[in-house]
Amino acid sequence: MQIFVKTLTGKTITLEVESSDTIDNVKAKIQDKEGIPPDQQRLIFAGKQLEDGRTLADYNIQKESTLHLVLRLRGGAKKRKKKTYTKPKKIKHKHKKVKLAVLQFYKIDGSGKVQRLRKECPNATCGAGTFMASHFDRHYCGKCGLTYVYQKEGVEA
C-alpha cells in the first residue's frame, strides 16, 4: 500500500509499505529518500507520536494515510551554576512565650481591686483588648492611629 509522509518544509514523500511493517522500517525508508537519520525522526499520525517497535496496523494506518515528520529536538535548558552564599543565613527571631503575660497589663491595689496599667483604645473599630502604646508625651493606638497628647503644666495653648 502507499502512504504519504509530509515533512516540515511542506514536501510530501510517497512510500510503498505494508500494514505489517514496523515504524522502524518506515523511518529507514525515509532515511533512504531524505537522508535524515532515524534517531532524529519523529512520526506523528492522528496527533500521536508513533513508537518504533509497533506496526502500521497497530495505529490503524491505512492506504493513502498521511504521516507528519518532525525532527527530534536535542538538549534542554542551560545548566545553571549552584549558588554560593558568602554570608551565613540570618537566624530568625524565636518568639519567647511568657506564661500569664497578660498580668503585666493589670495591677491589684491594696483593697483587692484590679486596675488597668495600660489605656485601652475607645475607638469602635479597634474592639476590646486593644491597648494604646504609652509614650513619654502621649498615648497612641497602633491599629487606628488615635493619639492622646498630655497637657504640660504651665503651658497655655
Swiss-Prot record:
There is a cross-link at G76 (Glycyl lysine isopeptide (Gly-Lys) (interchain with K-? in acceptor proteins)). It comes from the Eukaryota. Keywords: Cytoplasm, Isopeptide bond, Metal-binding, Nucleus, Ribonucleoprotein, Ribosomal protein, Zinc, Zinc-finger. GO terms for biological process: translation. GO terms for cellular component: cytosol; cytosolic small ribosomal subunit; Golgi apparatus; nucleus. GO terms for molecular function: mRNA binding; structural constituent of ribosome; zinc ion binding. InterPro entries: Ribosomal_eS31, Ribosomal_eS31_euk-type_sf, Ribosomal_zn-bd, Ubiquitin-like_dom, Ubiquitin-like_domsf, Ubiquitin_CS, Ubiquitin_dom, Ubiquitin_ubiquitin-like. A zinc finger (C4-type) spans 121-144. Coiled coil: none annotated. Ubiquitin is encoded by 16 different genes. Ubiquitin is generally synthesized as a polyubiquitin precursor with tandem head to tail repeats. Often, there are one to three additional amino acids after the last repeat, removed in the mature protein. Alternatively, ubiquitin extension protein is synthesized as a single copy of ubiquitin fused to a ribosomal protein (either eL40 or eS31) or to a ubiquitin-related protein (either RUB1 or RUB2). Following translation, extension protein is cleaved from ubiquitin. In the N-terminal section; belongs to the ubiquitin family. PANTHER family: UBIQUITIN. This is Ubiquitin-ribosomal protein eS31x fusion protein. It comes from Arabidopsis thaliana (Mouse-ear cress).
